[in-house]
A protein has these predicted regions:
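C-terminal, flexible cofactor-proximal segment of oxidoreductases
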Residues: 117, 351-459
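Dinucleotide-binding/catalytic capping subdomain of oxidoreductase cores
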Residues: 30, 161-309, 390, 394, ...
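Glycine-rich dinucleotide-binding loop and its adjacent helix/turn
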Residues: 106-185, 343-355
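Glycine-/small-residue-rich beta->alpha transition segments that form the dinucleotide
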Residues: 96, 100-107, 153-154, 319-332
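N-terminal Rossmann-like dinucleotide/flavin-binding domain of flavoprotein oxidoreductases
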Residues: 30, 38-96, 253-270
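N-terminal Rossmann-like FAD-binding beta1-loop-alpha1 element of flavoenzymes
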Residues: 4-26, 157-163
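Beta1/beta-strand and adjacent pyrophosphate-binding region of the FAD-binding site
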Residues: 1-10, 143-150
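FAD-site-proximal beta/loop scaffold in flavoenzymes
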Residues: 118-136, 285, 291, 303-370
Length: 459
């Protein structure tokens, strides 16, 4: 029997486990899917916006994999760090270990004032409204009148949409009670989404963009002069010597052009505005009374080579809440090699490289392998590549002498694993919490609540 540990139960971890079951070269495989949290699914549970039910429904296909009898979910197990299992110890327990630990850190803006109260990463905000147990309980300045979201990807659009969406609509989702109450009493009326380049370089998808325009009681505001600055905006179909833009960019430009030329009529009792801004590079977060009060942007313009240059002009945008959404990056896992320049673990076709040499029995998949790129489905092919390497190495790996019962060894080392039955208990507790509040399922947002629920103890 080939015993494999997969560290991380998000999409990359589950797809890795699935690929191990689907391959035929090593018929007898047993997989333990370990996670630091007592809950599975990673960013599908804690990163997908609560109003995106279709994407969240992906949990059912991940669940089907984790319920296979050859797979054991082992939550609430720390790997690396103080009190955690070291990679060296995991190699003693399993023939192979695949690290699928994602890229949890956010990229900073690296500008003065970034650490002022009222300035947060989008990751912190998403974790809060997604009920991640590590999230700060509160502190988001939702009494603010104006918010700035720095970044023009789907995460930026997500957080802007949640800020602008009414509590009545979010009530139908699994947003935790405290976040729902806070968002319901939010005074944010203006949300600025700002990017340093033009609309043709924006990373959001057209579907996400259109959702903003469909929000009830929200008006989209786009400055046509900022669109006109972008050379690609003028001729999206291309021309002599100029290739046509990708279809998604052309569709985005059409949506933005529509909002700028034919702004939708102001709905009755207009409450909120989302302003799409381009060619603005943040240079400083402004302070007043010890808190963030705005963002100073340098105005940029196309440099003719796909980038931007500063124009020498500046613009201050008032904001009492600033959320940065300029990308994720991986963080080092103690005991594993790490490439700080790329925020990834060095590898060759998924095999972990130590000092340039493949380390037997150690593998990576997902964002910690390739960086935070692609969509959820991109993890499937990434996992298959890694599993192909592992299976190729399996004849040597399976000769290794490993512990007969890794779970017992985990408990003996002081870990208190939450297995699949414990997760099902958490699901039941969240359904009951929702019923008690007259809602659908509502997430439990704290460690003690999750662990009590996993043990079947009442809240």
């Amino acid at each position: 029997v080939l015993r494999v540990a997969v560290v991380g139960s998000g999409p990359s971890g589950v797809y890795t486990a699935q690929a191990l079951l689907q391959q035929s070269r090593v018929p007898d495989v047993r997989v333990h899917v370990l996670d630091r949290l007592p809950t599975p699914y990673g960013l599908v549970r804690y990163g997908v916006a609560p109003d995106h039910e279709k994407i969240k429904s992906l949990q059912s296909s991940l669940r089907a994999v984790l319920e296979d009898e050859r797979i054991t979910f082992v939550g609430h197990v720390e790997v690396g760090g103080p009190g955690g299992l070291s990679p060296a110890r995991l190699k003693e327990l399993y023939h192979a270990v695949v690290y699928c630990v994602g890229a949890a850190a956010d990229r900073p803006l690296s500008v003065p004032g970034e650490d002022l109260p009222g300035s947060f990463s989008a990751t912190e905000f998403v974790s809060w409204y997604s009920a991640h147990p590590d999230a700060a309980a509160d502190g988001f300045a939702l009494h603010a009148g104006s918010a700035v979201v720095v970044g023009v990807g789907n995460v930026a659009v997500d957080v802007a949409r949640i800020l602008a969406r009414g509590a009545a609509e979010l009530r139908a989702t699994d947003v935790p009670r405290a976040a729902l109450d806070a968002l319901g009493s939010s005074r944010v009326r203006d949300v600025h989404i700002a990017g340093r380049r033009g609309p043709s370089q924006a990373r959001f998808t057209t579907k996400e963009l259109r959702e903003l325009g469909a929000l009830p009681g929200v008006r989209m505001v786009v400055d046509g002069t900022e669109l006109a600055l972008d050379p690609a905006y003028a001729a999206p179909a291309g021309g002599p010597g100029t290739p046509p833009l990708p279809a998604v960019v052309r569709r985005n430009l059409e949506v933005l052009r529509g909002w700028s030329q034919n702004p939708p009529p102001a709905p009755h009792g207009l409450e909120r505005r989302i302003r799409m801004r381009f060619f603005l590079r943040p240079v400083e977060l402004l302070e007043r009374g010890g808190r963030v009060a705005g963002v100073r942007f340098a105005r940029t313009a196309p440099d003719g080579a796909g980038g931007v240059r500063d124009t020498g002009a500046y613009e201050d945008v008032e904001a009492q809440l600033v959320l940065r959404a300029v990308g994720y990056r991986g963080t080092p896992l103690p005991g594993l090699p790490f490439d700080p320049a790329h925020g990834t673990v060095p590898h060759l076709a998924g095999r972990v490289l130590r000092d340039g040499v493949a380390s037997p029995g150690e593998y990576v998949a997902g964002w910690i392998k390739r960086g935070p790129t692609g969509v959820i489905g991109s993890n499937r092919s990434c996992a298959k590549e890694t599993v192909a390497s592992l299976v190729e190495d399996a004849p040597l790996l399976v000769r290794g002498d490993v512990t007969a019962d890794p779970l017992e060894a985990l408990r003996a080392s002081g870990q208190l694993p939450v297995e699949w039955d414990g997760w099902l208990s958490i699901e039941r507790a969240e359904a009951e919490l929702g019923r008690s509040l007259g809602r659908g399922r509502v997430k439990i947002p704290d460690w003690s609540g999750l662990l009590d629920a996993a043990r079947g103890e009442g809240r």
